[in-house]
Amino acid sequence: MGRPYREAIEGLIGVSNSVVFSHGKESGPWGSKITAMAEVARDLKFEVLSVDYRGIDDPQTRVHKLIETLSAPGTSNLYTAPVLVGSSMGGYVSAAAAATLWPRALFLLAPAFYMPGFEQYTPQDVPAPTTIVHGWHDDIVPVENSVRWAREHRATLHVLDSNHRLEDQIPTVCALLREWLKSLP
């Protein structure tokens, strides 16, 4: 990410040490991936929140829920410049909310970018360093979508021998998350 973003984040007083998870459309706030990644974050002394989007199918409504959750009275100090982690639609939600929330960084799993009929909604103004993890055999969100977004936004991209859910790669995803969280400024 560019110098102005880094200076803006470093200038914040009380930047939180929190990780906020956003699950995918067919999942829940404490599925196996989020549960495993939350353990990693807690082990590194991060506060953890997983937003519950069950029953909300509209991606934009989910974006508004994330923004409202992190902007609610009493949460401002805890969630100043949080780390956003999202899977599939949750990856889209995290990236779309980034322009409002100014996160410290994003870690996205198979984010739902450039989906047919929704290409125009793919987030373009993401003001934070971003890492993407995607499966080569994803039959829901083509891996090419993440390659394209990563190239256009200079994001870090890890492509694993897995499918959309990455369930057979949870230990690898957690290892990537651990090293990534440890590297954050």
Locations of the language-model features?
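Serine-hydrolase catalytic machinery in alpha/beta-hydrolase-like enzymes
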Residues: P4-A81, Y92-A97
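Short hydrophobic segments within beta-strands
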Residues: F21-K25, V85, L109, V133
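Active-site nucleophile loop of the alpha/beta-hydrolase fold
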Residues: G24, Y53-R54, F107-P116, S162
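Conserved alpha/beta-hydrolase "acid-adjacent" motif
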Residues: W30, D139-N145
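Post-His helix in hydrolase/transferase enzymes
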Residues: T35, E167-K182
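Catalytic histidine neighborhood in serine/cysteine hydrolases
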Residues: L49, R151-D168
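Primarily recognizes the serine-hydrolase "nucleophile elbow" in alpha/beta-hydrolase
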Residues: L70-G74, L78-V126
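Short beta-strand/loop motif that positions the catalytic acidic residue
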Residues: V126-P127, I132-H134, D138
